[in-house]
Regions:
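Hydrophobic, membrane-interfacing alpha helices
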Residues: 20-232
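Polybasic, lysine-rich low-complexity intrinsically disordered segments
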Residues: 5-6
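Short, positively charged and aromatic/hydrophobic N-terminal segments
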Residues: 15-19
């Protein structure tokens, strides 16, 4: 019994030390948000969160009853998630939305900058519109009901949203208002260097866990096509 208590205390101490060191070293993430650098190639945490999100959404949808009822194969789900959803929808749509709303001057001076996805700059609203359009094309190609498919897709979306918001946090972007709270962070991208709310983490919790639970509860209470999609 004494050994178990000592061992438990040691584990607890090590865990707290790990968390403390992780918090202290968060500035390294903000200053250099790259997971791996091989010559000119840089793999950023933000890009990794996008990929992880897509993979988890893929496995989630493979097991969803609506996907099975529709009769989509694994290859169909693969195409829908990675080609239609991630590339054409989220990335291309997100980039176009960002450039049209926030990078108009750059777009006018250099129209090809629309395709410079590696420079960053993705709009949530543009990505949402892009995903909707991409799924409409996919549904037309597969001859399936759009709202029937989106009822399954929106249940998986909070998984991606929650993880990508963590990527925004590690990227030091989309930070919140100034705060005097101990939970505030100083982001290198902030020209004023103020302590700010980690709004990305708030959104990760709200758009991730909370939204997933709400949509799951709504889905369990109704079989009407389009209801879950409309709540999303």
């Amino acid at each position: 019994i004494c050994f178990e208590k000592i061992n438990g205390s040691l584990v607890f101490y090590c865990f707290n030390l790990y968390v403390f060191n992780m918090i202290i070293e968060l500035s390294d993430f903000f200053n250099n948000p790259s997971l791996l650098e091989i010559g000119p190639l840089k793999i950023q945490y933000y890009a990794v969160t996008w990929l992880v999100s897509a993979i988890l959404i893929y496995f989630f949808l493979q097991q969803h009853k609506i996907i099975k009822e529709i009769g989509l194969s694994k290859n169909d789900v693969n195409d829908m998630v990675f080609m239609y959803g991630l590339f054409f929808g989220a990335m291309c749509g997100g980039r176009m939305g960002y450039m049209f709303f926030y990078g108009t001057e750059q777009l006018i001076n250099d129209p090809l900058s629309l395709f410079y996805i590696w420079q960053g700059g993705l709009s949530f609203h543009g990505g949402l519109v892009g995903v909707i359009v991409a799924l409409m094309v996919f549904c037309k190609k597969k001859n399936i009901a759009f709202l029937r498919l989106t009822d399954a897709v929106v249940l998986a979306m909070p998984i991606g949203l929650g993880i990508v918001r963590i990527g925004n946090f590690l990227n030091g972007e989309l930070y919140g208002r100034p705060t005097n709270g101990e939970w505030g962070f100083i982001f290198p991208t902030d020209p004023f260097g103020l302590l700010r709310h980690p709004s990305q983490l708030y959104e990760s919790l709200g758009e991730g866990l909370v939204l997933f639970v709400l949509l799951f509860l709504i889905n369990s209470k109704t079989n009407i096509k389009g209801i879950v999609s409309s709540f999303f």
